[in-house]
C-alpha cells in the first residue's frame, strides 16, 4: 500500500511533527508512505517538496492579503482565519499518481485551495483527512472557543469586524466548502475523541465518515532518563524543582501563559521552584513570573528537547483550546507528570491524579493547586511510571499505524464499492 501524506510543512508546527511521526510509523509497519510538503525543512528522502515556483509564496501572500482586506486592514486575527482561496494542484505529480491513498493533514496557508481539494476528490483516489484542529469542519477558524455556529452553518463570525453578519465571509466560505464536498466522501480522522465529537456535530460534515486516532510518538527518542544528568547537560542547577511550559510561540494567547503567570503568583512560597519556558518569545514573559524563570527560547534539536523534559519535575500546558497536544504526549513519554485544563483532548491524555492533574477550565487557582500537588506528592514515582505506561499502551507507533492501516483499507474498499 502506498500512502501520500500531504501537509504544509514537515517540521514546523504540531501538525507537521505529528504527520512526520505517522509517516515513520507507517513505514515501520509495512506501508510505503511519503510526505508531500510546501516547506521542506528536513533532509528526509521520504519527504518531497512541491516543485519550486514563485507561485508557492504568492499563494500564501494572496490569501493573507485578502484576509487583511476583509479584516479592514487590521492584523488582529490575521493568522486565525484561513480561506483556502489559493493553493497548488498536486494531482499531476508522480507522487500523487503512484499513491493508493491520499492522506491530507494540515494543508492551510496556501498549500491547498478548496479547488485543489475538489480536484483531489475527483481524481478517484480514496482520501483520508486527519483533523489537527476544527478547521475542516468550520468555515474560517481553527479554534471555536465556544462558538457553536458550525453545527448549523457559519455566520456572524466572531473573528470578523463587528462580529460579522448573516451573510458574511464565513457564510460564503461555508457554502464553498459545501460545494467542494457535494457528492464526495472523505474519511475524517480526529486526533482526539473530543474533536471527533465536534466534527460529528458539524453541519458541514454530515454523512461523512468520522473516527478518532491519536498521534503516534517514537518512544525510542522520547523516553525517561536520569534527571540529574539531563540537568548537567543543560547547565541547570541540580537542586531546584523545575516547572516546564512549552509552546512554539509562548505569547500565543491560546496557550494560556496568563494563567501560568497568575498560578505562579499563587505559588510564590515555593522558593525552590524555577519555571523553564521553552519556545519563541520566552524572554518577553519571563519578567512577569513571580517565581524564578529561565527562558530557553525556541529549540529545534530533538535531543535537547528530550533533555529538557527529562530535567523537569512537572509540565504545565494551560491551553484554552487543544486537540491532543504533542507536548503532553512527549512529556509523559519522558515520565514527566503533566498539568492542564479540562479542555479538548487534554483529559484524554492526563488521567487525573494518576499521571498528572486536570485543572478546572480557566481556573488559575486550580492550575496552581495541580502544580503544587505534583511537586509535593509522596507518590511522584507512581505518577511518572503511569505516564510511561499510558504512552506505551495508547500512543506507540505500532498501535497507531495499525489503526490507520485499517482506515486506509476501509477508504479503498469504499471507493472501489462506489465505482
Each predicted region: which residue ranges?
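Conserved acidic donor-binding segment of nucleotide-sugar-dependent glycosyltransferases
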Residues: 352-353, 357-364, 373-378
Amino acid at each position: 500500500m502506498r500512502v501520500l501524506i500531504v501537509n504544509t510543512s514537515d517540521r514546523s508546527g504540531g501538525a507537521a511533527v505529528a504527520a512526520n511521526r505517522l509517516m515513520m510509523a507507517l513505514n515501520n509497519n509495512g506501508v510505503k508512505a511519503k510526505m508531500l510538503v510546501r516547506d521542506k525543512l528536513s533532509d528526509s528522502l521520504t519527504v518531497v517538496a512541491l516543485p519550486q515556483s514563485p507561485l508557492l509564496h504568492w499563494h500564501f501572500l494572496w490569501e493573507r492579503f485578502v484576509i487583511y482586506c476583509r479584516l479592514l486592514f487590521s492584523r488582529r486575527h490575521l493568522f486565525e482565519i484561513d480561506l483556502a482561496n489559493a493553493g497548488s494542484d498536486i494531482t499531476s505529480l508522480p507522487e500523487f499518481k503512484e499513491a493508493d491513498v491520499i492522506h491530507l493533514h494540515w494543508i492551510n496557508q496556501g498549500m491547498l485551495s478548496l479547488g485543489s481539494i475538489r480536484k483531489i476528490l475527483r481524481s478517484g483516489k480514496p482520501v483520508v483527512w486527519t483533523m489537527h484542529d476544527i478547521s475542516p469542519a468550520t468555515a474560517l477558524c481553527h479554534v471555536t472557543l465556544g462558538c457553536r455556529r458550525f453545527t448549523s452553518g457559519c455566520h456572524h463570525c466572531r473573528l470578523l469586524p463587528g462580529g460579522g453578519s448573516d451573510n458574511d465571509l464565513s457564510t460564503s466560505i461555508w457554502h464553498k466548502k459545501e460545494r467542494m464536498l457535494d457528492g464526495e466522501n472523505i474519511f475524517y480522522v480526529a486526533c482526539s475523541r473530543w474533536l471527533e465529537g465536534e466534527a460529528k456535530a458539524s453541519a458541514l460534515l454530515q454523512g461523512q465518515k468520522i473516527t478518532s486516532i491519536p498521534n503516534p510518538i517514537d518512544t525510542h527518542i522520547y523516553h525517561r532518563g536520569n534527571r540529574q544528568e539531563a540537568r548537567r547537560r543543560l547547565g541547570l542547577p541540580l537542586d531546584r524543582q523545575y516547572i516546564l511550559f512549552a509552546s512554539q510561540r509562548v505569547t500565543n494567547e491560546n496557550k494560556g501563559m496568563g494563567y501560568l503567570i497568575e498560578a505562579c503568583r499563587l505559588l510564590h512560597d515555593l522558593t525552590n521552584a524555577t519555571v523553564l519556558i521553552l519556545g519563541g518569545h520566552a524572554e518577553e514573559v519571563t519578567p512577569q513570573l513571580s517565581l524564578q524563570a529561565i527562558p530557553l527560547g525556541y529549540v529545534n534539536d530533538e535531543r535537547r528537547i528530550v533533555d529538557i523534559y527529562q530535567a523537569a519535575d512537572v509540565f504545565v500546558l494551560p491551553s484554552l483550546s487543544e486537540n491532543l497536544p504533542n507536548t503532553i504526549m512527549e512529556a509523559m513519554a519522558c515520565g514527566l507528570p503533566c498539568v492542564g485544563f479540562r479542555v479538548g483532548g487534554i483529559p484524554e491524555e492526563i488521567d487525573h491524579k494518576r499521571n498528572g492533574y486536570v485543572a478546572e477550565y480557566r481556573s488559575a487557582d486550580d492550575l496552581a493547586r495541580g502544580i503544587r500537588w505534583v511537586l509535593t506528592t509522596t507518590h511522584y514515582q507512581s505518577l511518572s511510571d503511569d505516564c510511561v505506561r499510558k504512552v506505551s499502551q495508547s500512543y506507540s507507533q505500532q498501535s497507531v499505524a495499525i489503526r490507520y492501516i485499517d482506515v486506509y483499507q476501509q477508504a479503498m474498499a469504499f471507493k472501489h464499492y462506489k465505482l
